[in-house]
């Protein structure tokens, strides 16, 4: 009987703790959306048309192939006003379903790049050519935050 009382008491304490922890959980007014890889580019002076020609041809072809194969959701090119010399003036944004999908599809994405752009040598050659017209100042991963409707 003593063991039964201890078990019932332990069960009651466990239920109480679980109840308190559930009650204590914060009700967040948002949920995670898609993930974005954002490249910050500085187009060199006088090279805007040359870089836009690359983006409208090879870069766009690769992005469309990645989208068709389900590796990405979308992509965007955002021109921004640079305020100081050497500051980035273009963002290349690639949208993924989530970070896990982005990581899981790396091999598939590389295969698409090989198919569309070419082998490693061709990709390196293109990167060197583009280095003459633009500079990659950095990349960031971002996660979209979807705000929930305000509850009444």
Q: Where in the sequence are the language-model features?
A:
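Extracellular/periplasmic catalytic domains that process cell-envelope and extracellular macromolecules
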Residues: 29-33, 83-88, 132
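Structural recognition of the beta-strand scaffold that forms the well-ordered cores
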Residues: 37-40, 74-76, 91-94
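N-terminal, post-signal-peptide region of Sec/Tat-exported proteins
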Residues: 44-88
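Short, solvent-exposed mixed-charge patches
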Residues: 151-152
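Positively charged n-region of N-terminal signal peptides that target proteins for export
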Residues: 1-5
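An amphipathic, aromatic/His-enriched active-site/gating alpha helix that lines ligand/cofactor pockets
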Residues: 27-30, 61, 65-73, 93-143, ...
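Immediate post-signal-peptide N-terminus of mature secreted/exported proteins
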Residues: 25-50
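Bacterial N-terminal signal peptides
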Residues: 9-19
